[in-house]
Amino acid sequence: MKLHPREFTAEPNNPFANDQLGRRAQVTSFCQMLIGAEGHAVVSLDGPWGSGKTAFVKMCAAHLRSSEVQETRPVRVIEFNAWHQGHTGNPLVDLVSAISAEISDPSKRLIQTAIKLIAGGASQMIRAASGGALDLGALTDDKNQELTAAWEQTEQGRNEFQSQLGAAAKSDGLILLIDELDRCKPTYALELLSTVRHLFDVPGVIVVLAINRAELAHSVQSVYGPNFSADHYLRRFADLHAQLLPPDQPERYEFFKHLQRDIGESSLGERGIWETLALVGEPDGCGLRDIQQAAHHYSTVLAASTTSGANSHGNLSYTIAILIVLRALDRNSYQAMAAGQLDGFQAMATVRKALTPASASQPSVADRELWDLEAAIFGFSSITQRGVKESYSPVTEEHDFAHSYVSATGIDAGNPAHVFRRYQDWNQAMSWLSPERAMTITAAIDMFSPA
């Protein structure tokens, strides 16, 4: 079992070798659009946290550098991970350093000019010249002269920088791929956006911003206030807006097969396991990074919980997967259930609610999956309650089960019968599981949780 996830890589000689989500068609069409763009443009690529944006950007870079593209339309490609490469805290210097690493510039003129500008130089020079004064009309003549000189120096530096950048992009064009912007400090992210918009506005330069728009909007509001129209503000920075499409069910299965090989846990390839763990990405987004973390969490807990062939007793692995999902979706309910303080019917109602999108009235998973999930949750809850309540009596009659199920969930339509039969099967398969053993499993889940 591997504890550290392998970093995604894409190479120009085979850009899609590690494409686990079937995104080749999306990448090639997106890159074709970038190559065909004339003049200057800023393109935003929006996707929720953990949707695979970084992998998409890396495949774009590799495809653009491939001989297939370079032989027909040569283009220079610069990758900039704002989270990892924002070393100086100065977006312009960081960006130019990344560009200079890819483009031959013996005299380092681009870097020298960038240093003169000092990323967002106009605003910084105004603050320096005014001594922090807010009322520009109150400036003295000397300060006004300093202010005028600062503006002239900034404008001259801007023109010089754009001239040098344009020369670098003139022959083949330049595509700058910026990733992980929404993970940066709000002030850095906003300054980088302004830098791109106002200093990289050069013919032949195409900028791609891979972002989580919702998260970046929060960064904007943290600076300008909660009532600020952040989405409208962000749209001003891009000329074209693209949306990363979520993977469908077969593509998710391929992703789990990749995780199975990467982590070294064979049970990740079992349908019941991967379908269950994939629920951490429900109900409102694909959450691939959440799924990856859940897979590592599951493998670690399974290794810590399996002793003397315990997993051969029934479906311990499936139960662990379900508990991890419940913890991810509703931690308070999970903790209450683990402590024997949550009734099994309440636990099932919690699962239904957690898996129901905000815009829907029903869970976003198939009935069969939901029944299995509810049955295991109810069974495990019964065991934890037995450990803390001396007078606890398990439900043995279908009629009693159905009545309590409908009261807790508000759902009938034959569901109670399906869940009750699955609960009986689960209870028989997991008859070896004692309250003490259940406690060690939940302790391992809490200990090795990613967050």
Positions of the model-derived regions?
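Walker A/P-loop-proximal flanking segment of P-loop NTPase domains
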Residues: M1-Q70, V77, F420-A451
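Conserved Walker B
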Residues: I178-C184
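P-loop NTPase nucleotide-binding core
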Residues: S51, V57-A167
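Alpha-helical lid/collar subdomain of P-loop NTPases
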Residues: R289, Q293, H297-G379
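Residues at the beta-strand->loop junction immediately N-terminal to the Walker
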Residues: S44-D46, N81, I178
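The catalytic "switch" region of P-loop NTPases
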Residues: M1-N18, G22-V27, H63, E155, ...
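Conserved AAA+ ATPase small/helical "lid" subdomain
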Residues: I118-S130, L240-N315
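Charge-biased C-terminal accessory regions appended to nucleic-acid-, cytoskeletal NTPase
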Residues: R6, A358-A451
